[in-house]
């Protein structure tokens, strides 16, 4: 899942460094998330559904696949985008030369939340990489992380992302009956990578790291190592030994060549 400017490839960008991926022996595929669900709030979408290809009256095309009336627990845009990632994988399974048993799903920010959910719901993804995914992604809700976003902020700023029932936890992050390490643990025993940035206070880097740590017992159940902390928690000291990887990059809220390089290092180690 990528931004439009990165899909058209009119200029090189670290956000989607295709040249470096190819140089290292990896294929690259991307889809535009807003082709599946618009990334903005609109009363019609809130009441009737989020997955659209066409403009009103929404009577045919892709929209015809979805219920006309949303319930409190109907899925939001994050789930639609994750569903889209699985449809990309469907196609990759038909492409000669692509080993569909070794496909990673990678996302940044809201895309990181999407990647986690795609990995949790589709076990065909061999590696799940969530970059700067923050609240409702890889950041724990039950731990206070200074300046990090909250459930209320996510629901108020992006009410189309999740089901409406989730709003009952606005201002109640600490009483949510589960936490994000449960979501991360659903990837086990496959490969998981959580990435943070030191200057990305909103995503709560420490809370993201704790999710990697506290999800790891799920890998132990399979007789495998989760996060192996073979060094100090500090900037640009990646943890790659276990099947849960982590790094803290210097800088702000972005997906950079450093992040991609560490993802590929991890894949080289565990998927080659």
Regions found by a protein language model. Name each.
Residues 87, 94, 130-183, 204, ...:
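Mobile cap/lid helix-loop segments that gate and shape the active-site cleft of serine hydrolases
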Residues 23-29, 99-102, 123-127, 188-192, ...:
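Loop/turn elements at helix/coil->beta-strand transitions in domains of secreted/extracellular proteins
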Residues 157, 213-272:
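C-terminal catalytic histidine-bearing segment of alpha/beta-hydrolase fold enzymes
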Residues 85, 112-123, 128:
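Short glycine-enriched nucleophile-adjacent loop
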Residues 97-109:
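Alpha/beta-hydrolase fold nucleophile elbow
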Residues 188-205, 249-252:
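Conserved strand-to-loop "acid loop" that flanks and positions the catalytic carboxylate
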Residues 1-94, 137-143:
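Cap/lid segment of the alpha/beta-hydrolase catalytic domain
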Residues 77, 109-112:
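Active-site loop->helix "elbow" adjoining a glycine-rich segment at hydrolase catalytic centers
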